[in-house]
Amino acid sequence: MTQTPHAGDWIRIERLTAFGIVGLHAWERERTQEIIIDASLRVDFARVAATDEVRHGVNYAEVSREMLHHAETIERHTVEALVLDLAGICLSYPGVEEVVVSVAKPRADPRARLIGVEARRLAGSMDRTALVSLGSNAGAEENLPRAAEAIAGIGRVSRVTRVYQTPPAGGRAGPDYLNAALALETPLPAGALVRRFKQIERELG
């Protein structure tokens, strides 16, 4: 469904098929429906072409997996909300300059082959501010900076507080906590952002 513009370098993901809950009617909330996703991501291939190393490009398999997981778990009421969620996910990957995403429901109307929506967004146009609190009392001096660095990979950190030291809550025994907070500018929808945070938490142990 998505029509890729000719100018620039583009990654195309076509007919990614998800099965999820999307719709307003009661019957649409009872069982999953087929959801067809197309996405075109404008990037610059110069560096990855020069080095021939995947790490210098956008991992489109990872983009596909994240869009698929989001579409199958978020349970949006409208395809308009879902398509903007997916656009935000695409723009969260470093190097993506523009994205065109379409979402279609093949069985939305039996008289039409499919009915869908399309959204085009530029990098930075969907950024929102997420206020993130950090805290640890297990290897905190090492883990707190590592967590902040990992979070900076999700978006742009615009503000950071100083580090505060506090005792465990409720008078419990144990090491003191180190705490901080930061403001993160990111296009990610809330559900995808929480999943990224949980992944960082797992990686840090």
Predicted features and spans:
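N-terminal, polar/charged subdomain of small-to-medium soluble alpha/beta proteins
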Residues: 1-128
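Core catalytic alpha/beta fold that binds nucleotide/phospho-ligands
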Residues: 77, 107, 124-205
